[in-house]
Amino acid sequence: MKKILLYIILFLSGIDGAWALPIEKEGMSIYSPSLKQEVSYAIILPEGYEHSDTEYPVLYMFHGIGGDYTSWLEYGNVARVMDKMIKEGKIQPFIMVIPDGYLSYYSDTYDGSSLYETFFIKELVPYIDNNYRTR
């Protein structure tokens, strides 16, 4: 009986932090006329986003070469870091968007063959502003 009680206590103590994490959404996508393809992105919404009408600032995070839109979530653990810093009062709540940059260097090419900068400024930012409560 003591062994079962110990397992239950360990299990419950391990899940309390999970309830407090911000909302992570991976595999979201937007079609880009500039790039002529779907562009995947991840978005992290602050805790309480779903139950409020608060508008939040947005931070766009870009991954490095060889990474993708999930890199910051998988290797950088940004959702936990973001949540911890908000709870410690070091930063205010915000929305984080991590678009897939492919091998674009996040800029338009001189010959116009890749228009990632155009996509970001004219398509992604307005899309996020229109579909999420941003300020």
Stretches found by the model and what they are:
Residues 19-135:
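Non-catalytic cap/lid and distal C-terminal segments of serine-dependent acyl enzymes
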Residues 4-14:
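Sec-dependent N-terminal signal peptides
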